Amino acid sequence: MKKIIALLLALVMAFGLVACGGGEAASSEGGEIAIFWYTFGDTYLSSVRAAMNEALNASGAKYHNYDANGSQTTQTEQIQTAITAGAGVLVVNIVDASSDDATQAIIDMAKNANLPLVFFNRSVSEELVSAYDKAAYVGTDYTMAGHMEGKMIGEHLVANYDAIDLNGDGVISYVMFKGQEGNMEADARTQYGVEDADAVLAAAGKPALEFYDASNTSKYLVDQNGAWSAAEGQNYMQTILTQYSEANGNMVELVIANNDDMALGAIAALQAAGYNKNDGGVTIPVFGVDATAVAQEAIAAKSMTGTIKQDAVGMANAVVLIAQNLMAGKDKFENVQGDLEGTWRVNIPYSAYSG
C-alpha cells in the first residue's frame, strides 16, 4: 500500500510540473509547433495554412492548428492551453492586431514559458516584439500593397478612361472597402490605393477620383466585424446599387477593396445586378489584394480587373523555417527568404497580378 501511495504522489508531482509550464520546465526542444489563426474563414490565410501544413508535413514536424474564430479571448486561452500541453514554439496570427495589450499579453505568456514566438501576417508592434529575443514577425511591407494597387488602378483608368466614365462627367466615382479599423495594412491600402491612383491620373491630366457618397467623410466602408469578408463586400455593394445606378446617372464606376474576399463579394452583387458578366455588357473595374485562387479565376473570367499578389507559400515557408530555427537555437533568420528588417522582422514581397 505504501508503494502504491508513493507512486500516486510521484505521478501527481510529475503532472504538476507539466501543467505549470513556466521557465525552463517548458523547454521548446521536442515540443510541437502550435499555430494560432485569427480565423479559419479567411481565404488568403487558408492558402497560407495549406502551404504551412505541407512544409511541416514534409519536415516531419509535430504541429497543431488552432482556430480563434475572430475572438482574441479564445486565442489567448488557446495559447495557454498549448503552453500547458508542452508546445515547443508559438506561431501566432493575432486576432486583435490593433491592440498592443493583446500583443504584450501573448509575449508575456511566451516569456514566462521560455518559448520562442513567431507572429505573422497581422501586424504587431516592433517595440514589443524586439524586446523579446526569442520573438520574430513575418509580414509584408504593409505600405507596398497600397502603393502597387493604386498604381495598377491609375494605369488601368488612364488606358480606359472614357469607357469607365459611365455618366460622361469626366470624373471616376469609386467605392473603397476597408477590411478593419486600426489595422496598419488596411490603413495603408485604403490611403495609398487612392492616393497613388490619383497621382497617375494627375500625371495624365485627369481629375482625382471621387468617392461616390459625398456625405461619407472617411471615404471608405469598413467591415464592422474586422473580418475583411466577402459577405460585407457583397452587402455593402447591394445597398449601394439600390441608390446608385446608370439610370440615375450616379453609378459607382470603380471598386477598390483591401483584399480579394471583399472584392469578390462586391462582384457577386454587381453580377446579380447584371454587371461584370463578360457577356458584352458593362464591367465595373474591381481591384483587390492577395491574388487568391478564386480571385485569379475571376480575373481570368474578366469579372475582376486586378489584384496584388501576397505570396502565401513564401510566407508559410518563412514562418516554418523561423519557428524551427528558434526551436533549434539557431539564428532566427538563417536561410529565410525575404527582406529582413532589423533583427525582428522579415517581409515577403508583393507583386502585381492581372492575369
Residue map of PLM features:
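Short, low-complexity disordered leader/linker segments with a strong preference
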Residues: 1-32, 57-58, 62, 105-115
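Extracytoplasmic "Venus flytrap"
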Residues: 31-51, 55-56, 63-81, 85-87, ...
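Hydrophobic alpha-helical segments within soluble ligand-binding/sensing domains
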Residues: 33, 75, 136-169, 188, ...
